[in-house]
């Protein structure tokens, strides 16, 4: 039985994106197409499936690091900034990602039943969320044709 730790994260997030795209509870809000993903960005994301991709990434991060709060996830999705994007004029300064995007996506994952709020600890994955991750990882492991992953099958 494969778990989410047995497959590469990029492929798992890609497969979860396709799975979460079919969910009714997970869809981008109206404001999402105009919102930057952090202070260090100049423009909103250009990907069509950005919202479901971020939700899939959040689901994996909560499963690996959970229970985890929004502030810790903001730090995970942040980057470093050296002044404006055009003029790199100062030393690196760590900035955080957008809390509203993370919070709203987590609330949608809660509505779908994949994440729950634990008291005073943040959010953690439910049994349904863990089984979705592990089932997706198992399907992905059989699809991937990579010799280094054969020992997990």
UniProtKB/Swiss-Prot annotation:
One of its GO terms (molecular function) is RNA binding. Residues 120-133 have a biased composition (Basic and acidic residues). Disulfide bonds: none annotated. It comes from the Archaea. Pfam families: Ribosomal_S19e. One of its GO terms (cellular component) is cytosolic small ribosomal subunit. The keyword Ribosomal protein applies. Residues 77-99, 113-139 are annotated as: Disordered. Keywords: Ribonucleoprotein, Ribosomal protein. One of its GO terms (biological process) is translation. InterPro entries: Ribosomal_eS19, Ribosomal_eS19_archaeal, Ribosomal_eS19_CS, WH-like_DNA-bd_sf, WH_DNA-bd_sf. Part of the 30S ribosomal subunit. May be involved in maturation of the 30S ribosomal subunit. PANTHER family: 40S RIBOSOMAL PROTEIN S19. Belongs to the eukaryotic ribosomal protein eS19 family. This is Small ribosomal subunit protein eS19. It comes from Haloarcula marismortui (strain ATCC 43049 / DSM 3752 / JCM 8966 / VKM B-1809). The lineage of its organism: Archaea, Methanobacteriati, Methanobacteriota, Stenosarchaea group, Halobacteria. The gene is rps19e.
